[in-house]
Every structure is written in structure tokens, then in C-alpha cells.
Regions:
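Conserved non-catalytic scaffold segment of RNase H-like nuclease domains
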Residues: 2-125
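C-terminal accessory extensions appended to soluble enzyme cores
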Residues: 235-282
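Metal-dependent phosphoesterase core characteristic of DEDDh/y 3'-5' exonuclease domains
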Residues: 2-4, 65-89, 107-208, 212-241, ...
Length: 282
């Protein structure tokens, strides 16, 4: 069993260079100025609009995304919060390489929300672009227990899969699910704003948003582990307190800190009666 749990999230935007290879010529021309320079933001927006017309949704297929941020909550093997941070890197290549190196060196248990349906396949496609390697991630020496096994959560858990009973139901957006369960959800920035923030040169705002998503996902993970009997009340409350203490001390300038600390305080207060259950756990 791994010594760490890594709850991660990726933020992406359209890969304009990849779009150039596939978009109709008239669309490319409409994003090109009189000097022949292509406006990558305009091209990306046009591609999203074209996707909306064709499919009803503006979200592009996985192979047209590039990574701008990967954030993660690191917890111990029992789920106790250690820290939240963003993977360093001067560009996409370095960010992905550092994330894959972390998996290679520490073999963490990976937890995500729709990671199996988007983040992980997208990351591996982008890794191939840079000829990166991820042998530990693809290790299948244990056929039924590895990073890519869908129905075993020992090494990787996609919370969307598990909470939806493996997609038996739809419509479980992370934002609305978390808000319904008393967490902050997406209180400030939404995923469709990442493109605007990137071209407005606001990487810090993207980082804040990505970290807040991982905090929501981590808290959802705690609730799910509590639900299925993998975690007791004492561990649940102490993990929330550790998260609140860390972000209050180390992430005070982040816009997500106040909403999360307030929600955690309310959660502990509202469910204080469960502390009586702690005696039965011991």
C-alpha cells in the first residue's frame, strides 16, 4: 500500500497548434490578422463555438487540450491532510514531467474526479507529445490491482466513477455535488474561465482555482471514505481540522482560504453530535 494519497486536478486550455491542423481553413482565416498572425485565443474560442454547434457542448475532445496547471492535495495513507500545492514547471512539458516523476518516485494512491474520463488520458497523450515515460503508472504485474484498474481503488480512485455507481447516473458535476454537501464548490472561478485567465496573464488565479478544486475533491473523498466505512469520525474531523490549519497558516493569501475555513468550521459545529460516536470507535 502506498504511503501517500495524491488528490489531483488539471486545468487545461485548447491547444491552438493542434487546432490549426484540423480546423477548417475559413475558421483559421477568421482568427488571422492582416499580417498573417494567428490570434490563438480567438482561434480557441472559435473552435469551442464550433464544437458547441456540432455537439451541444463547447468542451473540446481530450486530444485538443494542453495542461496549464496541475494541483494536488497530499495526504498520508490513511487520508490525513498534509498539504495542498501546485506542481512546479516553467511550461507544460516540465509540469507533466514533474508530476510523472512524483508518481514514479513515490507511487501515491491517485484520487480524482473524472480523472479516468479526462485528466489521466489527457495527461498521457500530452506525455507522449514530449516522449515522457510513466512505467510505474502502466505497470500491470498485478492484473487486477494497478493504476489503470477501474473497479479496484487501491492505486487509483475516480470519485465520479464510484459515487455515480460507475456512471449509472449522470449529472454529478463536482461543483453542484460539493455545494450540496456543504463544501464551497466553485465559489469564484469556473473551468470555462481558465482560457480567459490564461490569455489575460493571470496564472495565479488559475493556480488558486485549481488548488480549490483539489480541496473540494479531497473533502469529497473524505466524505466518501466515511460513508463506506473506510474512515471513522475521529479521522474525518481531524483531517478537516488539519486542512483548515494548513491553509490558514500557509495559504492565507489565497481567495479560497476563507470559504474553506468557514465551511469546515460549520461542518464541525453542525455535526458535533457525531463526536459521541468517537467513543464507540475506540
Amino acid at each position: 500500500m502506498s504511503e501517500y494519497i495524491c488528490v489531483f486536478d488539471c486545468e487545461t486550455l485548447p491547444d491552438a497548434k493542434a487546432l490549426l491542423r484540423t480546423l477548417p481553413e475559413d475558421l483559421v482565416k477568421s482568427a488571422t490578422d492582416k499580417n498573417g498572425k494567428i490570434d490563438e485565443k480567438a482561434l480557441s474560442l472559435l473552435a469551442c463555438e464550433e464544437q458547441r454547434k456540432n455537439s451541444g457542448q463547447a468542451f473540446l475532445p481530450v486530444l485538443f487540450h494542453k495542461v496549464v496547471c496541475i494541483s494536488a492535495v497530499l495526504a498520508d495513507k490513511n487520508g490525513k491532510f498534509i498539504k495542498v500545492n501546485t506542481i512546479e514547471g516553467k511550461d507544460e512539458h516540465e509540469i507533466i514531467a514533474n508530476f510523472l516523476n512524483f508518481i514514479e518516485n513515490h507511487a501515491p494512491r491517485l484520487v480524482s474526479y473524472n480523472g479516468r474520463g479526462f485528466d489521466l488520458p489527457m495527461l498521457m497523450i500530452r506525455a507522449m507529445k514530449y516522449n515522457l515515460r510513466a512505467p510505474r503508472y502502466y505497470n500491470t504485474s498485478d492484473k487486477w490491482c494497478n493504476y489503470r484498474t477501474r473497479y479496484d481503488a487501491t492505486w487509483a480512485m475516480d470519485l465520479l466513477d464510484y459515487i455515480s455507481d460507475f456512471r449509472a447516473v449522470s449529472g454529478l458535476r463536482l461543483d453542484t455535488l460539493c455545494a450540496m454537501l456543504g463544501m464551497p464548490g466553485k465559489y469564484d472561478v469556473h473551468g470555462d474561465q481558465v482560457l480567459e485567465l490564461f490569455y489575460a496573464n493571470k496564472p495565479q488565479k488559475i493556480k488558486e482555482y485549481c488548488e480549490s478544486d483539489t480541496l473540494n475533491t479531497y473533502w469529497l473523498f473524505l466524505k466518501y471514505e466515511l460513508l463506506r466505512g473506510k474512515m471513522g469520525y475521529e479521522q474525518y474531523f481531524s483531517s478537516l481540522e488539519a486542512m483548515s490549519e494548513f491553509i490558514a497558516s500557509n495559504k492565507a493569501a489565497m481567495s479560497y482560504t476563507k470559504p474553506f475555513c468557514e465551511c469546515i468550521e460549520k461542518e464541525i459545529k453542525d455535526f458535533s453530535y457525531l463526536k459521541n460516536e468517537l467513543k464507540t470507535e475506540k
